[in-house]
């Protein structure tokens, strides 16, 4: 059964990282329900782990229609294009070529350099003095510099990429013209880098993408450009926000910080658990569209209707995760959906894991006494954005 009147959506408060209680209520009483977002069409909202995983992994739910539909969303502008808007077979073709180049081994090989970068950033924080803004000086710096290393961008140009990435960030206070200018400069730079790697390949990801082959198939020039910039943008905002959110939780939950200080070997599993526990989005983005009538929990989703599969709610489903609202860094198994599921499972998950593990490892090693430099009630949180996180995180140690 579903209620007659769609509920206003999203449910989460942007100030903080709590998961709205409405999700748990719906899991119990109406796991497939109608919602009305502030922009776009009404949609079906799916909240139980089993159902969310099924929707994300079922070929009867696709992303392609998002290119032409007024898709349900929490922000006025629509995010279109890229791998996330494609369906098989075109999506399969591109992903197959990218996976040949962007391997878990390649991500892991960046761990030593990621550590060096993290230590350099902490050095700069220490030199600046206390309080230091962890968001500006660490969380926004580490991901873009690691991605630059991955792509093969020379160190001398890292600051340029940091500026461009900052303009792409949904929390950035820039005009549409400034964002467009940053995009044009980033595309021009990456086009030049691709040309150089065609002539003189190295062991970086751009060279590997240029050389990627699947039988007689290869990436076109535009596909190379879109993928390289897409990796930068997709990998930047999410990991930046996760670093800030995870450190915020360590500072506001002393027992959690003490546990990781005493047992740093738990950091990899802590990253998995925090990825599960933190409902990163204000709401659920990137709807899937039914290509035929599908019945889920006794509810018929008609062909063409959009479905929002809430991974944030699924990751707190008590039926899948015992004591789901508790952060348990020893939790096993932990088959969370923080990086998605199915054909659109996050390509950058191995790199994100490396970055998040290194961030916690280095910060706890270098700044074991790290704590908030202002009262928690004075923190400013991003508003009107896709992802939830503090705009600044003043810290002392």
From Swiss-Prot:
Q: Name one GO molecular function term.
A: heme binding
Cofactor(s) listed: heme
Locations of Basic and acidic residues compositional bias? Answer: 68-78
Q: Which Gene3D superfamilies match?
A: Cytochrome P450
- Record region (Disordered): 63-86
Q: Which UniProt keywords apply?
A: Antibiotic biosynthesis, Heme, Iron, Metal-binding, Monooxygenase, NADP, Oxidoreductase
Pathways involved: Antibiotic biosynthesis; mycinamicin biosynthesis
This entry's Enzyme Commission designation comes to 1.14.-.-
Q: Where does heme bind?
A: 91, 95, 288, 344, 346
Question: Transmembrane ranges?
Answer: none
Q: Which residues bind substrate?
A: 81
Give the GO terms filed under biological process for this record: antibiotic biosynthetic process
Q: Does the keyword Metal-binding apply?
A: yes
Q: Which domain of life is it from?
A: Bacteria
The record ties this protein, via CDD domains, to: Cyp158A-like
Q: Does the keyword Transcription regulation apply?
A: no
- Which InterPro entries does UniProt cross-reference here? Cyt_P450, Cyt_P450_B, Cyt_P450_CS, Cyt_P450_sf
Q: What does this protein do?
A: Involved in the biosynthesis of mycinamicin, a 16-membered macrolide antibiotic. Catalyzes consecutive hydroxylation (at C14) and epoxidation (at C12-C13) reactions with mycinamicin IV as initial substrate, leading to mycinamicin II. These reactions require prior dimethylation of 6-deoxyallose to mycinose for effective conversion by the dual function MycG enzyme.
* Entries under PANTHER family matching the protein: CYTOCHROME P450 YJIB-RELATED, P450, PUTATIVE (EUROFUNG)-RELATED
Q: What family name appears in the similarity comment? A: Belongs to the cytochrome P450 family.
What is the protein named? Answer: Mycinamicin IV hydroxylase/epoxidase
Organism (species): Micromonospora griseorubida
Lineage, highest ranks first = Bacteria, Bacillati, Actinomycetota, Actinomycetes, Micromonosporales
């Amino acid at each position: 059964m579903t209620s007659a009147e769609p509920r206003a959506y999203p449910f989460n408060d942007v100030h903080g990282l709590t998961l709205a209680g409405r999700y748990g209520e719906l899991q119990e009483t109406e796991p497939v329900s109608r919602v009305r977002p502030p922009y776009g069409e009404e949609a079906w909202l799916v909240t139980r782990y089993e159902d969310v995983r099924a929707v994300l992994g079922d070929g009867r739910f696709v992303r392609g229609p998002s290119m032409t539909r007024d898709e349900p969303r929490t922000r006025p502008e629509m995010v279109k294009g890229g791998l996330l808007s494609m369906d098989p077979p075109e999506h399969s073709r591109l992903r197959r070529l990218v996976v040949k180049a962007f391997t878990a081994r390649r991500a892991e090989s960046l761990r030593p350099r990621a550590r060096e970068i993290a230590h350099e950033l902490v050095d700069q924080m220490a030199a600046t003095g206390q309080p230091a803004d962890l968001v500006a000086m660490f969380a926004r710096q580490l991901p873009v510099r690691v991605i630059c290393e991955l792509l093969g961008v020379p160190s001398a140009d890292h600051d340029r990429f940091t500026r461009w990435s900052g303009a792409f960030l949904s929390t950035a206070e820039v005009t549409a013209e400034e964002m467009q200018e940053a995009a044009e400069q980033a595309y021009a730079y990456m086009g030049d880098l691709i040309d150089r790697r065609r002539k003189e390949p190295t062991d970086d990801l751009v060279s590997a993408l240029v050389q990627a082959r699947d039988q007689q198939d290869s990436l076109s020039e535009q596909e190379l450009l879109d993928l390289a910039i897409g990796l930068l943008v997709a990998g930047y905002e999410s990991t930046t926000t996760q670093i800030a959110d995870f450190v915020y939780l360590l500072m506001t939950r002393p027992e959690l910080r003490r546990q990781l200080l005493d047992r740093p070997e738990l950091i990899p599993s802590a990253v998995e658990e925090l990825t599960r526990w933190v409902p990163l989005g204000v709401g659920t983005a990137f709807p899937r569209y039914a290509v035929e009538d599908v019945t889920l929990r006794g509810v018929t989703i008609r062909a063409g209707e959009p479905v929002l599969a809430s991974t944030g709610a699924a990751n707190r489903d008590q039926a899948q995760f015992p004591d789901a609202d508790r952060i348990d860094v020893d939790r096993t198994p932990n088959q969370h959906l923080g990086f998605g599921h199915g054909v659109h499972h996050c390509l950058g998950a191995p790199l994100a894991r490396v970055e998040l593990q290194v961030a916690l490892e280095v910060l706890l090693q270098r700044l074991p006494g790290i704590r908030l430099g202002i009262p928690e009630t004075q923190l400013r949180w991003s508003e009107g954005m896709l992802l939830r996180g503090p705009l600044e995180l003043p810290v002392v140690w």
